[in-house]
Design a protein with these regions (language model features):
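Residue-level signal for the nucleotide or nucleotide-sugar donor/cofactor binding architecture
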Residues: 53, 82, 90-93, 130, ...
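NAD(P)-dependent short-chain dehydrogenase/reductase
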Residues: 125, 148-208, 212-221, 238, ...
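Alpha-helical elements of Rossmann-like donor-binding domains used by nucleotide-donor carbohydrate transfer enzymes
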Residues: 15, 57-60, 64-67, 97, ...
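C-terminal substrate-binding subdomain of Rossmann-fold SDR/epimerase-dehydratase oxidoreductases
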Residues: 192-311
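N-terminal Rossmann-like NAD(P)+-binding domain of SDR-like oxidoreductases, especially those catalyzing
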Residues: 1-167, 289, 301, 308-311
Length: 311
């Protein structure tokens, strides 16, 4: 098959693009490189630097494409609180621009990578796709809005649409920005640097941490799975882990670091875990990596965390 991957130089986008070319597919990648790194990509990926709001460029890249994976987005919950307009412009405006270009060219399927963050605070866990979203940040609002645009434009113009709500992905190569770094990568950096793993408000908040290879498996399956048009599907590990337990596991894995608890309230919902029933039924999705195994592989495969020898 011929694929276009937007956000192809990012953490998940590059892992997906590289997996697709290894499987024998033709892959075009698009990324504005605001945060991505094209060095992540296999030489077999036909990479173009550009913006998803550049319609003429999209028209060219979409020629003869069978399926689009749309990952291009701003992805920091905390940053979105500071810059909601930019998140709306990129995450919503960019998605609409891409869907219009797909309509113009006649591409028949899109897999949109959304986020478990759209659910917000939910009483019932693990959370299923039937739950009514209660987005609690501009990032979550932008992803939910983009979902509606994808599904509505797809319905009107006969484009098959699949929405994957990915939970807290982690793994080797995950970006470590100076501010608002993802918690797994941040804790690993702190531990391997003999620092303190700062845990807020007791560390009782829970998340579903899913290893990058499992996420890629779910994304790859969505391109050809039957009966998934206009479906929303969770992609996670199905395991609920507290931040405190995550910190403990990272200290055990690296044999370095210590936990520093602070009463400061960190933003975010109290609990979030994916119900994977629909993913199993529709995609045959079964995550293979426990958190302990995923952390071991992350340390083993990411040179940033190899100051500490892996036993």
């Amino acid at each position: 098959m011929n694929f276009l991957v937007t956000g192809a130089a990012g953490f998940l986008g590059s892992a997906l693009a590289n997996t697709l070319v290894k499987s024998g597919h033709q892959v075009r990648g698009l990324d504005d490189l605001s945060t991505g790194d094209p060095a992540r990509l296999s030489s077999a990926v036909l990479f173009t630097r550009g913006d998803v709001q550049d319609r003429p460029k999209l028209w060219t890249l979409l020629q003869d494409v069978d399926c689009v994976y749309h990952l291009a987005a701003r992805v920091s919950v905390q940053e979105s609180v500071l810059y909601p307009r930019e998140y709306n412009q990129v995450n919503v405006g960019g998605t609409v621009s891409l869907m219009e270009a797909m309509r113009d060219v006649g591409v028949k399927r899109v897999v949109f990578i959304s986020s478990g963050a759209v659910y917000g605070e939910q009483k019932d866990q693990p959370v299923s796709e039937r739950a009514i979203p209660i987005p609690a940040s501009p990032y979550a609002v932008s992803k939910l809005s983009a979902e509606y645009y994808v599904q509505t434009i797809g319905m009107l113009w006969k484009i098959e649409t699949v929405v994957l709500r990915v939970f807290n992905a982690y793994g080797p190569g995950q970006p470590l920005p100076a501010a608002h770094a993802p918690v797994v990568a941040r804790f690993l950096r702190q531990a391997t640097g003999d620092g303190s793993l700062v845990v807020y408000n007791g560390g009782h908040q829970t998340r579903d941490y899913v290893y990058v290879d499992d996420v890629v498996e779910g994304m790859a399956a969505a391109a050809e799975a039957p009966g998934v048009d206009r479906r929303i599907i969770n992609i996670g590990s199905g395991a609920e882990t507290s931040v405190l337990n995550l910190a403990d596991q990272i200290i055990r894995q690296t044999k370095h670091g210590e936990i520093l608890k602070t009463p400061h309230e960190e933003g975010g919902v109290s609990r979030l875990c994916a119900d994977l029933t629909l993913a199993r039924q529709l995609l045959g999705y079964r995550p293979q990596y426990s958190l302990a195994e995923g952390l071991r592989l992350t340390v083993e495969r990411d040179p940033r965390f190899q100051r500490v020898a892996v036993p």
